[in-house]
């Protein structure tokens, strides 16, 4: 007796059954109650029941969806952003001219410090980790050939654009692909999306918001975060510094506060440049808005560890990226 192929038999059986008309449903039409019951029985074979209909509608229809962030992808040289750069670090892209190249130049707070010309006195922890990640064998300084000229003339920030917190870093031997949130809530690209905290070096962070006190004065709903690039003179050599500032004050009050903070540094720079001073060097720096968070949010302090080195950080859990233009500080 020949052996029957079970799969072939099931396929033939299925094809034959398709040729038969479907079994009819018995519907009672003589009485209204019996008609409704028979209709429900017929429909129950084709639909699924919802055990908690109220929860179903509230979860699927009433919950407010998150605001979709705007992502940006960049291809960069592998060594210009270290593979251990923490997720949440704020990034800047640098471009002097549109050369048509698909390779971008990206700076993090740590890599920016490495090319700034500052010593360990200004930010000890950032200085230490910058040499661990971007040491003497790194080519990060070569990405900007006229770096010294831009710093001396106070023009580096003119080619610098904030592109938001880092949310993905895919490293390879030669080219690295990174993703950042340019605008909107800082969420990663997973499904479902997860919140990413803004991470800033505490050595480079200044909180200008007054401590919470009992007062009848109205409070601002948001605190804004800014990047401040300045061009001081260190040991008669022009350098630049990147500082992150948190403030819920108006722009006018913020600039007045910055003039007080940097008054001695500005005076020292102008004294050092009095023999080589002209109008193009009058700019001391520039300020740029990066985004905001709730005014009730207090940035948390943390530490990022790497091979025995520790980088004190400031974490902002509800940061929303919304960068603005650079504003000159004279």
UniProtKB/Swiss-Prot annotation:
One of its GO terms (cellular component) is viral capsid. GO terms for biological process: viral capsid assembly. InterPro entries: Herpes_1. GO terms for molecular function: DNA binding. Keywords: Capsid protein, Host nucleus, Virion. It is found in: Virion; Host nucleus. HAMAP family: HSV_TRX1 (MF_04018). Structural component of the T=16 icosahedral capsid. The capsid is composed of pentamers and hexamers of major capsid protein/MCP, which are linked together by heterotrimers called triplexes. These triplexes are formed by a single molecule of triplex protein 1/TRX1 and two copies of triplex protein 2/TRX2. Additionally, TRX1 is required for efficient transport of TRX2 to the nucleus, which is the site of capsid assembly. Belongs to the herpesviridae TRX1 protein family. Interacts with TRX2, MCP and capsid vertex component 2/CVC2. This is Triplex capsid protein 1. It comes from Saimiriine herpesvirus 2 (strain 11) (SaHV-2).
């Amino acid at each position: 007796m020949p052996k029957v192929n079970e799969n072939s038999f099931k396929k033939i059986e299925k094809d034959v059954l398709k040729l038969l008309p479907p079994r009819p449903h018995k519907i009672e039409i003589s009485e209204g109650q019996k008609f409704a019951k028979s209709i429900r029985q017929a429909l129950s074979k084709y639909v699924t029941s919802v055990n908690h209909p109220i929860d179903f509608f509230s979860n699927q229809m009433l919950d407010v969806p998150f605001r979709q962030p705007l992502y940006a992808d960049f291809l960069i040289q592998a060594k210009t952003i270290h593979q251990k750069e923490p997720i949440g670090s704020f990034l800047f892209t640098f471009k002097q001219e549109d050369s048509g190249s698909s390779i971008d130049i990206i700076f993090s707070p740590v890599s920016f410090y490495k090319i700034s010309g500052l010593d360990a006195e200004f930010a000890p922890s950032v200085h230490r980790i910058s040499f661990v990640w971007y040491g003497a064998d790194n080519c990060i300084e070569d990405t900007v050939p006229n770096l010294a000229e831009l710093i001396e003339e106070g023009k580096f920030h003119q080619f610098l654009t904030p592109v938001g917190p880092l949310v993905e870093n895919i490293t390879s031997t030669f080219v690295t692909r990174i993703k950042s949130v340019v605008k909107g809530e800082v969420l990663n690209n997973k499904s479902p999306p997860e919140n990413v905290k803004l991470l800033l070096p505490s050595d480079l962070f200044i909180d200008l918001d007054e401590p919470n006190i009992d007062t009848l004065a109205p409070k601002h709903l948001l605190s804004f975060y800014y990047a401040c690039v300045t061009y001081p003179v260190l040991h008669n050599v022009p350098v630049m510094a990147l500082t992150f500032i948190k403030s819920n004050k108006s722009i006018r009050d913020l600039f007045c506060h910055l003039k007080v903070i940097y008054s001695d540094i500005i005076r020292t720079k102008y004294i050092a440049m009095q023999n080589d001073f002209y109008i193009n060097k009058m700019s001391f720096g520039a300020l740029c808005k990066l985004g905001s968070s709730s005014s009730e949010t207090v940035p948390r302090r943390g530490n990022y560890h790497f091979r025995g080195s520790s980088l004190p950080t400031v974490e902002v859990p509800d940061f929303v990226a919304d960068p603005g233009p650079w504003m000159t500080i004279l």
